[in-house]
Amino acid sequence: ILLKNGKIYDGTGADAFLGNILVRGDRIEKIGEGLICDGAQVIDLQGLSVSSGFMDAHSHNDWFAIRKDPRPFFEPFIRQGITSFITGNCGLSATGFTPDTPYLDKIGGGLFGYRGDETSVYPSAGALLDAADGRSPCNIAVLVGHCSARAGITGFDGRDLTPAEEEQMLGAMEKSLKEGACGVSLGLMYEPGLYVSIEELKKVARLAERYDLPMTVHPRACSAVSMTYPLLGRPPLLRALDELVEITRGTRMKLQYSHAIFVGRRSFRCKDELKEIIY
């Protein structure tokens, strides 16, 4: 296929330029001006723009990737130009748990989940990434979710883990990091992350730091009033950020705060202090 006369944005940040693109099979073979190819199907893009695919940097589409036929779920994204996804966010990954878990129904925190014959089960990232590479029409990177790893050990039980359970959880997460997971995610607003101690979260943070990989965090609160914290005192969304500072104190790890949002008008007054803490 020869795409002619398009305004090309190559994704590097360089200025757009007019040119042609030669596609052979599922690969771009050449980009440039004046390209010709005998026998190629020619599509004239006069007046149109062409770009590299867009990336959705905060996605939960690993839960589509585990579908036995994921293509219908990805088609709407492709039609919008989105071709790559960072998945496994908010601690709720579709992978990263012990393979013999009796709590498969708890993986996904109640927001997502395995759905019988419609989905395949991938306890570690390597298996999921291999399956996605063969079946998904899009590029998938996956974070290993702390909520999923913990739920695989004790379900939604709110107690502290025993040393043996903690070792199992961290071992399942580390296995996925070794197999190509791109980082770790926490979901402190969701079960079971909602109940977890600072000390447990520090150990998860150290795991990510050891592999020099990022940790993304959905905090316990994004509002000025939250049942997660006492009603009086410092606004909950700032307490939630204080918690992340404590978890990562003394490390040189990469931390992504997701999401820096202000729920409710009373939370707006916190924006300046939140920015000061982050920066």
Identify the meaning behind each predicted range:
Residues D69-G183, D212-L213:
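Divalent-metal coordination cores built from histidine and acidic residues
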Residues A127, D160-G187, E191-Y279:
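Histidine/acidic residue-rich metal-binding segments in metalloenzymes
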Residues I8, I28, L92, C147, ...:
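Short, glycine-/Ser/Thr-/acidic-enriched flexible segments
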Residues G6, I21, D26, G47, ...:
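Divalent metal-coordination and catalytic microenvironments
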Residues I8-G53:
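Histidine-rich, glycine-flanked metal-binding segment
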Residues L2, L22, D56, I86, ...:
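Structured core elements
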